[in-house]
Amino acid sequence: MQHISVKAFAKINLGLLITGKRQDGYHTLETVFSPINWYDELTFSAADGLGMSCSTIDLPADDSNLCLKAAKALREYAGIDKGVAITLTKRIPFGAGLGGGSSDAATTLRVLNALWELDVPQGDLHGIATGLGADVPYFLETKGLAYATGIGEILEDLEASLPFHIVTVFPGEHISTVWAYRNFYPRFVRQAPDLKQMMKDLCLRSDFSVLPALENDFEPAVFDHYPAVRKVKEQLLEKGGFYASLSGSGSAVFGLFEELRDAENAARFFREHFPVALTEPFFTMQ
């Protein structure tokens, strides 16, 4: 092996309902993940030990990095001492609710499982992924839309993809997941919508009547504390989006567009101020 370069894509959340809190302190949720065309690039090179470098000094390249955590977890599971040098070119904003770190970890697991010829059973790989982060199994196991419950690790592949243009904007605020869970406004007692059926109605029939129920429970608190993030959502709708929402715990916000022209105009507008990604219809992770 000289080196192998792969893309690690980001995700957005279509609806995010916080449904309860477990005894171990983790919150349970219900959401639908969708991939977007915003990615980090990871390069894996032969090495005697484990090492890592990162394109930005804002992220650690030490044992706290999820890529190295993933490599070490895989080595420990397999009882091996193989090495690899990982180079991370970071493009997905962190603290954005886009799952960049989780995607990097999942990519590391998938690539090293193949490079080290481990053939780890899917169930065991899922367990390793969940130990690294609740979003990691999504990036490891699916390519398009997926319905998630538990803490985000229980997945059902919806075998579909969004038939719309997606404009995703990072307003520059780094919001920690810990902060978001401490500050969201609980709404545990309610009649939860059927997210799976709503996604089918939206993707297969363009049934926009389901959109008001696609809520993100982090939005009210995030918007109260970060009014600039609220403004981005409002502007996405003003620019022609038929739906806009916070992704995850933020601060990234995305809008769905029927017309390419409107999506391109919106992306052009926001690029004057913030990092932006434009994703084509029916996008899947490859």
UniProtKB/Swiss-Prot annotation:
<feature type="binding site">
    <location>
        <begin position="93"/>
        <end position="103"/>
    </location>
    <ligand>
        <name>ATP</name>
    </ligand>
</feature>
<keyword id="KW-0067">ATP-binding</keyword>
<keyword id="KW-0414">Isoprene biosynthesis</keyword>
<keyword id="KW-0547">Nucleotide-binding</keyword>
<dbReference type="Pfam" id="PF08544">
    <property type="entry name" value="GHMP_kinases_C"/>
</dbReference>
<dbReference type="GO" id="GO:0050515">
    <property type="term" value="F:4-(cytidine 5'-diphospho)-2-C-methyl-D-erythritol kinase activity"/>
</dbReference>
<feature type="active site">
    <location>
        <position position="135"/>
    </location>
</feature>
<keyword id="KW-0808">Transferase</keyword>
<dbReference type="GO" id="GO:0016114">
    <property type="term" value="P:terpenoid biosynthetic process"/>
</dbReference>
<dbReference type="InterPro" id="IPR020568">
    <property type="entry name" value="Ribosomal_Su5_D2-typ_SF"/>
</dbReference>
<dbReference type="GO" id="GO:0019288">
    <property type="term" value="P:isopentenyl diphosphate biosynthetic process, methylerythritol 4-phosphate pathway"/>
</dbReference>
<dbReference type="Pfam" id="PF00288">
    <property type="entry name" value="GHMP_kinases_N"/>
</dbReference>
<dbReference type="GO" id="GO:0005524">
    <property type="term" value="F:ATP binding"/>
</dbReference>
<keyword id="KW-0418">Kinase</keyword>
<comment type="similarity">
    <text>Belongs to the GHMP kinase family. IspE subfamily.</text>
</comment>
<comment type="pathway">
    <text>Isoprenoid biosynthesis; isopentenyl diphosphate biosynthesis via DXP pathway; isopentenyl diphosphate from 1-deoxy-D-xylulose 5-phosphate: step 3/6.</text>
</comment>
<dbReference type="InterPro" id="IPR006204">
    <property type="entry name" value="GHMP_kinase_N_dom"/>
</dbReference>
<dbReference type="InterPro" id="IPR036554">
    <property type="entry name" value="GHMP_kinase_C_sf"/>
</dbReference>
<dbReference type="InterPro" id="IPR004424">
    <property type="entry name" value="IspE"/>
</dbReference>
<feature type="active site">
    <location>
        <position position="11"/>
    </location>
</feature>
<dbReference type="InterPro" id="IPR013750">
    <property type="entry name" value="GHMP_kinase_C_dom"/>
</dbReference>
<dbReference type="InterPro" id="IPR014721">
    <property type="entry name" value="Ribsml_uS5_D2-typ_fold_subgr"/>
</dbReference>
<comment type="function">
    <text>Catalyzes the phosphorylation of the position 2 hydroxy group of 4-diphosphocytidyl-2C-methyl-D-erythritol.</text>
</comment>
<protein>
    <recommendedName>
        <fullName>4-diphosphocytidyl-2-C-methyl-D-erythritol kinase</fullName>
        <ecNumber>2.7.1.148</ecNumber>
    </recommendedName>
</protein>
